[in-house]
Amino acid sequence: MRSTEPAIFGAVITHTRAVLIETVGRDAYETALRKLPEADADLYARANALDWVPVRVIEAVAVACAEVVGRDAMTLNDEVSRLGSRRAFGSVWRAFLRFTSDEALMTRGPTIFGKTYSHGRVRPEFSGQGTATIHLEWPSAPELVVRTLGIASEELLAAGGRERIRIVTERARGGAVYRCSWRE
């Protein structure tokens, strides 16, 4: 069941949690969880593939882990998101994505986003060969979500064989806008 507060699907969390532990180390991860309220730490640590984990808990985990390892929380989250997305799209998906047109590749975003986040919506506009604009429709989207969507979009394009990918993210009244360009 989806959370009433903004949340991320457990299948994504279980994958990301493994990447986070690999990145910061198990000791740092466990130390970070002890800094959180017990209910939040348990919710994150015990999340399974069918759960929905509130974004606020994920942000708290990122901040606590960053404090433990002496890093910036958003930069650490970016690294974990990039590696997690790269692994997710780099598996069997890579072979399928390479034979997908630019337009078809960009239109996968709303489906992936809708299965990942409990709130918000993504609307791509295919502008032509090698360009697209992605609109995140979520006025109060947390910074973690805004950044992660840009990173995941870049990794999706890279898995599809696109090169020289550039994504410029701007906060907008209704959420965020991502201006994307690439070469095949």
Question: Where are the predicted features?
Answer:
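Amphipathic interaction/junction segments at domain boundaries or subunit interfaces
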Residues: A47-T148, T169
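Short beta-strand or tight-loop elements
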Residues: S118-G120, G161-E163, G174
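Beta-rich nucleic-acid/ligand-interaction surfaces
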Residues: R166-E184
